[in-house]
């Protein structure tokens, strides 16, 4: 959702910070969403046991349908390389701004949900350190850690979304 909001705001306002955020979030949303879709569909086959491979359950078709999604619009590996390459040409400024935002929301949650807020803070600090390390590397060296970096970023953003949802409850 935050990716869609960033895209809409970038389109509506033309502001550089929204454009940078939309650009940063797009490969994360695409790759993480499709990776999770594959995992969930494979679990669907698994929970059906041997019947998961039988067409009548529908699980095998879901699995086949999901499997192509990490390939559409650039494979997820390419999306990750885009994240650490083109999307970090600003020395990680857009990434650091987003991490700062996560940490501000985490700070606001410490009184109400100290354990969860502490975990999200710790994860966001690890992401900050990974981002600092990533932007310090030459471009070609960044690619080796691109996929794990994208996954870490997605998990921190997901944790932040869950923290905000828990606060709204």
Residue ranges and their predicted role:
Residues 1-169:
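Flavin-dependent oxidoreductase catalytic core characteristic
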């Amino acid at each position: 959702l935050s990716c869609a909001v960033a895209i809409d705001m970038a389109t509506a306002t033309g502001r550089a910070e929204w454009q940078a955020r939309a650009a940063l979030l797009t490969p994360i949303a695409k790759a993480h969403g499709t990776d999770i879709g594959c995992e969930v569909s494979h679990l669907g086959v698994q929970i059906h046991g041997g019947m998961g491979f039988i067409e009548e359950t529908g699980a095998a078709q879901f699995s086949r349908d999901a499997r192509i999604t990490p390939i559409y619009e650039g494979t997820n590996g390419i999306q990750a390389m885009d994240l650490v390459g083109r999307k970090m040409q600003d020395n990680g400024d857009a990434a650091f701004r987003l991490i700062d935002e996560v940490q501000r929301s985490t700070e606001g949650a410490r009184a109400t949900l100290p354990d969860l807020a502490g975990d999200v803070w710790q994860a966001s600090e690890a992401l900050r350190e990974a981002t600092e390390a990533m932007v310090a590397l030459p471009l070609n060296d960044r690619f080796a850690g691109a996929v794990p970096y994208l996954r870490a970023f997605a998990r921190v953003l997901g944790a932040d979304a869950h923290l905000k949802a828990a606060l709204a409850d």
